[in-house]
Amino acid sequence: MDKIIFPIKNELNEFENNLKKVVLKEDNFLISDLEKFMFTNPKRLRPIFIFLFAKILKIENCLVQDIALITELIHSASLIHDDIIDEEKTRRNNPTFYEKYGSKLAVLEGDFLLSLALEKISNTTLEISKIFAKRIKKTILGEINQNENLNNLTNIETYLNKTYAKTANLFIVGLEALFSLSRENKNLLSFIENYALAFQIKNDIDNFKSNKSDIKNGNYTLPMLYSSLEKSLDFVENLKIKALKELNSIENSIYKTSLIELAKYTLGS
């Protein structure tokens, strides 16, 4: 992973410093837990994609850092809220806010991160604000639809639509906002659409192979619908191939190489 992110190491270091300034500046008695949650072995996949595409599209704009911050704050807030809905006790080998403080304080902590994101959004363009509003709404509707279908073995199309709405949107939103700053290669959005869907399905497969908490929570995923891990893995592989084909129009560079390697690393080569 270090080799993959090396070309954007400076951008990621700046991002971490900016994120700490935003998250840790407010007086919040849960701040030590929030700091651990936000800064202990983070993946930062969304900011990494944003910075790589910014380099590929030669976007030199201070809003790139803001878009990465907003995307990560919304993603982090969604994790806290997901833990409440799923009644999860641990995340990344640490107690969740829900487990440690109960649903009321956990909701507020997630809302706190959302408020920080909204504050940042207010300093962007009108188009970027509309993009985030649209995608956040779709994500929430996806969560509502998932809960409506709990304990129902739905068809594959319904599962894919739910997965796209609930999870893929939080990958897509940052890049859609970024692409609004460039007149070139806006068709690259289809790359992240295919990648994000594959990424979540792979997570569902990993969950099915390990603790099966999705099934316990009444959330039936692709391995259950197919009754086959092999078919589910093939589905992910096909989405990965489709995603990588979308990069053929991009000229070769260290950033494109990192993008390809990141997709392979996270989805399986």
Which role fits each region the language model picked out?
Residues 202, 221, 237-244, 256:
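Short amphipathic alpha-helical surface patches that serve as generic macromolecular interface elements
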Residues 24-229, 264-267:
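Mg2+-dependent prenyl diphosphate-binding active-site environment of isoprenoid biosynthetic enzymes
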Residues 6-9, 122, 164, 233, ...:
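Short amphipathic alpha-helical segments with heptad-repeat character
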Residues 1-20:
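N-terminal amphipathic/basic leader segments beginning at the initiator methionine
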Residues 254-269:
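Short, amphipathic C-terminal "tail helix"
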Residues 15, 198-201, 243-246, 262:
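Amphipathic alpha-helices that form helix-helix packing interfaces
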Residues 228-250:
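Mobile late-domain/C-terminal helix-loop "cap" segments
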